[in-house]
Structure formats: C-alpha cells, structure tokens
Design a protein with these regions (language model features):
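Cell-envelope/extracellular polymer assembly enzymes that use nucleotide-activated donors
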Residues: 2-4, 34, 179
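Short hydrophobic beta-strand elements that form part
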Residues: 4-8, 37, 60
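Short, well-formed alpha-helical segments that are part of the catalytic scaffolds
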Residues: 12-27
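Residue-level preference for short helical/loop micro-motifs built around acidic side chains
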Residues: 14-18, 44-48, 57, 69, ...
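Short beta-strand/loop segment that forms part of the nucleotide-sugar
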Residues: 31-41
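A conserved acidic beta->alpha catalytic loop
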Residues: 39-47, 93
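Acceptor/aglycone-binding surface of glycosyltransferases and processive sugar-polymer synthases
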Residues: 57-80, 85-87, 97-174, 178, ...
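Hydrophobic helical membrane-anchoring modules
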Residues: 171-360
Length: 360
C-alpha cells in the first residue's frame, strides 16, 4: 500500500523544512511513503530546498498557476506514480503530520473514499468571529449541496483513495476544497471526517486576504457547482420566481383595470414589467432544459475521462505511459514501513487490513 503526501507550495522556503520534518516516516498498514512537492512558480528556491530536504518528487511550474491547478496536477502526478492513497497538506505546517495516520485509517479500512481533517474552526484562536461564522455557513452550504456530512469543507488536509482521486476533476482556479466535496457527493463517494489539531499560525492566509473577495469567490464556486450538477432545480427555481412575479404583476394590472375602467386604463407599468418577467421565466426555463442536457453529456464525458485516466495509469505502471511535464524524481529513498507492524485498531475492535485482500 503506497502513500504519497503532496504539498502544494508557493514561496514556502521558510516553512517547508518544518513541514517535511513533521511528516511520519512510517504508518501501520502503509508499505511505502513518498513526498511530492508541487512548486507553483516559486521565486525563492522552494523546489531546490525540497530536493535538499529529501522530498522524493518535485513537480515544477514555470509560473504561478493557482492553488486549485497545483492541487489537481499533484493528484495526477500521484496517480501516475502509483499512489494507493494521497494525502494533501499545506506547506506552511498548519496541519500536524502526527494526524496523518488517523487521516488515512478510514481509507485503509475501506470505510471512506475521502477523509477530511476537521480543524474544529470554532475553537481556533487565530480565527475571528466573522471568519468562524463564514466557515460554518460555507460548510453548511456544502453539506446540503453534496449530501455529505463534511464538517470542515474548506480544510485542505485530506486523504483520498485511488478510486476517488481518479474520479474527481477540478474546474476552477481558486480552490479545490468545496468543489471536490460537492463532486464527491454527486459521484456517490463516501466522505468521512477526522478531528485534527493545527499548529500555531506561521503566516496570514493567502486565500483569505479580503473577506469580501473570499466570500464572492467561494460563492461563485458553489453557484457554479449547483448549476453544473442540478441545473433543473437551480434554473427552475429562478424561473418559478420570475413566473410568479410576472403573474402577480399581471393580476395587479387586471384588478386595477377592472376597478377603474373606463376612467383609467390601470397600471400599465405593472403589465409591462409582468410580461417581461414571464418572458424571462420562459428563457430561464429553456436554460434549465439545456443545462439538464449538458449535464447528461458532461456525466458521459466524465465517465469517459475516468476510463481514459485509469487506462493511462495502467499503461504508466507498465512503464510505457507518457511522462508528466515538470515532474522530477529525486535520489531520496521512499520511507518504508516494516511488514511486521501490527495493524492499528479502529473503534469497535475492528482492525485494518495491511495489504489489499488481507482479512481485517
């Protein structure tokens, strides 16, 4: 069972050393641990430092492409390198490496496809009250949109099984956290939570520079996800509101027309706005129909992409697959777990299988 820990980086030279030193060198049930550093166009020598500190793989971008792109490229590289489980963590040492064994345990046990580290944001000292409210609101919205029980939707500390990693695709460039959870719920993947601890903050968040901007961009991600996966419900709701508004204004015009005719012709403005609202309702209804047809085509396309990705990975394991641009293998040896280690216990007395096919 191979675990690859991926770390997206942008000018993290000052923090990467502590992050790598904190990672576990062995985990019961995992036979090989490797580290992939994704250098998102850093200008401070982050990639060179990663090699010096013993990272096993470095994926370099010539320029900054954004966190979501770096995350998705890292997942592709991990799959290409044969990872059975992928753990994503931050380069600023926000998350504790000691929590990784508990994070991967549900995936090892076959109880979850994705495990999200719950930071319990209500108790984080460096979170302002407004940030806590926004995090709670965002997680509630994502829970409803995804049909999962995720408690900390914006947490980037997560473990992903190979099947789930091959199924999910990131479409936006801002962040992957919300979109992948919504996709996972829509795809029927099992999402679990594990409470984790966080280290003291080492620098301000680069995604949360402006509260207004952060809310707008995350709201856009959620609206886009609703439009992609539930177009009939999303556009149908808007069309219904417009239709009811138009009919209400039309009824108002008829009431005043009947009450005051022939002295007055009624409130003509209500008639004009009402007709416009009904026309818009019809157009938005057509958008709902077209969105549903596009969604059906997208589902077929995603299924095809998953099959192509799995075929590419199978060919890659034979050594004949295409290489990933910018991916470099260093001289560091994988961290290996001794095969004699006992499997960790789970709540209720269950035990993890050390290898695929072993009885739990």
């Amino acid at each position: 069972m191979k675990l690859i820990i991926q770390i997206p980086c942008l000018n993290e030279r000052d923090h990467l050393g502590a992050t790598l030193a904190d990672l576990p060198r062995s985990i019961p049930g995992i036979t090989s641990i490797e580290v992939l550093v994704i250098d998102d166009g850093s200008s401070d020598g982050t990639a060179e430092l990663a090699e010096q500190l013993g990272a096993h793989h470095v994926l370099r971008f010539a320029r900054n492409r954004g966190l979501a792109v770096a995350y998705a490229a890292g997942v592709d590289a991990c799959l290409h390198l044969g990872a059975d489980i992928i753990v994503n963590t931050d380069a600023d040492n926000q998350y504790r490496g000691a929590d990784i064994p508990r994070l991967v345990a549900p995936v090892l046990a076959g109880q979850a496809d994705i495990v999200v580290g719950d930071r319990r944001t209500d108790s984080l000292a460096h979170f302002s009250w407004l940030k806590r409210v926004l995090q709670r609101w965002g997680s509630n919205v994502v829970r409803r949109a995804s049909g999962t029980a995720v408690r900390d939707a914006t947490s980037g500390f997560r473990a992903i099984g190979r099947k789930a990693a091959a199924t999910l695709f990131v479409h936006n460039r801002f962040t992957y956290t919300l979109e992948t959870i919504i996709q996972a719920g829509h795809a029927g993947l099992a999402v679990a939570n594990v409470a984790v601890e966080t280290n003291p903050q080492t620098r301000p968040s680069r995604l949360f520079r402006s509260i207004g901007g952060y809310v707008r961009r995350n709201a856009a991600v959620i609206v886009r996800a609703y439009s992609m996966y539930w177009p009939v419900q999303t556009f149908g709701f808007v069309a219904l509101l417009l239709l009811l508004t138009g009919l209400g204004l039309g009824a108002r015009f008829l009431y005043y027309f009947a009450a005051r005719w022939p002295q007055e012709s009624g409130h003509t403005e209500s008639l004009l706005v009402g007709v416009g609202a009904v026309v818009l309702a019809f157009l938005v209804g057509l958008m709902a129909l077209l969105g549903d047809l596009i969604a059906a085509n997208r589902r077929l396309s995603e299924q095809l992409l998953v099959q192509v990705r799995q075929l590419d990975l199978a060919v890659g394991r034979l050594g004949d697959g295409p290489t990933i641009p910018g991916l470099q293998r260093t001289t560091a040896a994988p961290w290996s777990d001794a095969p004699a280690l006992a499997a960790p216990s789970l709540p209720g007395g269950a035990r993890l299988a050390l290898h695929p096919g072993d009885p739990a």
